[in-house]
Amino acid sequence: MRTLKDLLKRLLCWALLLALLVLAAAGTVLGVQGWKLYRATQPELPAAQLYETLSARPGFTTCDAIPQTYIDAVIAVEDSRFELHHGVDPVAIVRALWTDLRTRSLAEGGSTLTQQLAKNIYFTHKKHFARKAAELFAALDIEKHCSKQQIFEMYVNTIYFGSGCYGIAEAAEGYFGRTPAELTSAECVLLAGLPNAPSAYSPHSSPELALKRSQVVLDRMVSCKKLTKTQARELQDEIAALPVLAGT
């Protein structure tokens, strides 16, 4: 004779199975929608021609003209597994999905640099699940046709830094009156933190938040072994003394 405990176990198993089926069906629908959205972008600018097209734009800055500190800072704070994944980071996706489901929002991105590049080039910044699926397809295609260095260069030349500055060249000039190659390590760290939320972290309007964000960047660089704790403390003092944070 079945006990109440046995019945509850069976009900739980069926409920879990039903939930898995619903998730699988939803994933299939989103996958199809994402694929269609991604394919619609390709006739205008195919992934195979992306680097050739973007690198021909005036002011495009290559890695040999960008300080290593800036490269290290961006990868540390935005996509520490950049060199390991193929455009999509399953670990980051699972973490982001769990956060989104738990908070019933789309607040957590989990996007790699390649996905962010795909979003900047092909899609709007309005968050919805179909667009996230389309980003995955686009990122995989970009990684298939472009090297990691090319992807990084395209990313830093298309992201928004706030104050009307798009790309590292405009940001270096707009905030510091320099070329990217002339940036100091402190300036590199400050700039690396801005694209996450350009309006919120603007050195002009929110210097305190910009300084706090730079500390996040430094902490990530220490975690990724790109800086020692002593070097990070010294850089934070240099960042705090930057004229752009003092309104001068």
Residue ranges and their predicted role:
Residues 1-248:
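Juxtamembrane regions of bacterial inner-membrane/periplasmic proteins
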